[in-house]
């Protein structure tokens, strides 16, 4: 079954990291995802730009500059993993969390998934 691991963090802390600090963090996270990738269980993963680059479109078509949610932690990225159980997905999130200094990872089963076309 597919699970999403949603990555929430304090945007100002994440985007204030130096290039070296960010590179070290991504390298640590890659050691975790390498295991999933080798097993053919790692799907798309991404990091979003800052919410200052966001535009919100409400139902009906109203467009608002910036993010809708005004919270300390923002959704900054996600992983899609193929796991046998919720427990396996949670364990994957635990391994990722051990490599982070703060933030929250939310594990949620995927109800519908369309990989779309290959983007480059």
Positions of PLM-derived features:
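Conserved, structured core segments of small domains
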Residues: 1-120
